[in-house]
Every structure is written in C-alpha cells, then in structure tokens.
Amino acid sequence: MALAAEAVVPPTTGSAAPIVRITALRKSYGSNEVLKGIDLDVRRGEVIAIIGKSGSGKSTLLRCINGLEEFQDGSLSVDGKPLLHDSAMAMRELRQRVGMIFQSFNLFPHLTVGRNVMLAPTLVKKRRAAEAASQARRLLERVGLAEKFDAMPEQLSGGQQQRVAIARALAMEPAVLLCDEITSALDPELVGEVLRVVESLAVEGMTLLMVTHEMSFARKVSDRVIFMHQGRVHEMGPPTSLFGDPQTPELKQFLSSLHD
C-alpha cells in the first residue's frame, strides 16, 4: 500500500500542536476489525474530507473522535486532552469540544427550532434562557433561518432541518466539528443550501472533519482529503494531488467508479 501522505502532507511546525491527534487507533466489532491502526494529526482550522467506499471505516472514525464508539487500542486526544471512556468528566469535556452532525437531523419534534438550538447550552452549560435564546437567534441567522425561530421542525424542509442541526451543534461552541454524510438523506435540490453553510464555516476557520460523497465539494473546500480503504488511511494529501494524481490502484478504481 502506498501512503501518499508522507510526501504531500506538511508537518505540524512550531508550537502549534494538533487539535486532534490519533495514534495507532484500532476498533473492532467482535472479530471484525474496522479500524486497523489509524494515525492522523489535525491542525487547528484545518478542513479534512474523508472519502471511501461504504464499510471502509469512515463514519466509525468520526464516532471514535466524538466518543460515541469505544476503541480497543491506540490513543486519541482533542485539544491536548486524551479521550478516556472510563472518566465521565473527561467524556463530558470532550463532547463540549467536539460537535457532530449526522445524516439524520434528529431534531426534537415537540420543540420549536429555537428551543432545539437552545437545549444543550441551557442543560449542559447552564446558560440563562435569555442568553441562550439570543445565541440561538444569531446562529439561526448565520445558517439563513433567522425567521424560523418559532417554527416546528415538521414545518421545515430537509435542508432547513439539517441547517438547524448545524446551528444546534455550533451552539456548544465546539473546537472541532464532525460532519457524517450530512447531505446523504437530502433531496438533490436541497444539498447546495447545506453545503454553502459548511463552506462558510470552513472560510471562518472552523476545524472540520467531514465524511462526504460530494467530491466536487471536497475538492473545493478541503485542505486535505483522506481516502480510507478496508479500515486504513490508504492515501492522504491535498485535493489537487489526491484527485488529480492518485497513487494506488484502489483510489484510482474508487474515483473511476464515481464517473461510471
């Protein structure tokens, strides 16, 4: 296996430690090993797209970073703090630093849009209702839904619901935002409105790791693209190199299959 990362990924320099550091990470479900020794450093403000076939371990990697999945070997730290599954306090701190947006929107149907965005800051960060409401209004404006504060989720399109989910994740002021195929459940005409919001976050300097099938989007906004294959980081590099000059047969075949 040829790992392109060695040649094309600039090392972290100076005192800027990586905001996410993953070392020799292994994750199994029973006898099925789905992550087979992942090594990855993510710099603050970096945008990384993760691509690959279904079952290659992409979503599992994100769920490990967020603490939703427990790994068997290796280490993972966020902002210098190790992920410790046996420490409830460490896990709470991690989840305040790492936001995650899923394929399904998972909005609370009985709460208004504004209340959905306010919920975590009031419960977890103990913010006053007025302060949380003000923040929710700002975030809804940021994702283009300022007028939907009092609407119910059922009144929104899928694209609008996913933008509310983005606002909800941002309400916890995460240092890192994980996006797990967040457009895959949307009708094609709604994908663009969600991707525009994600692109604006990238421009503003949010650290983003996103599993995506939107290759043109990955090429446009990413600093690095990771191609995962059979539980490993198979190739990694800038989008121009990875898409324009794939080094392994597996990546060449994957990219070719997208155009069949």
Whereabouts are the PLM-identified features?
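ABC-family P-loop ATPase nucleotide-binding domain
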Residues: M1-R26
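C-terminal boundary and immediately downstream tail of ABC-type ATPase nucleotide-binding domains
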Residues: A2-A5, H229-Q230, M236, T240-D260
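ABC family nucleotide-binding domain
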Residues: A17-P239
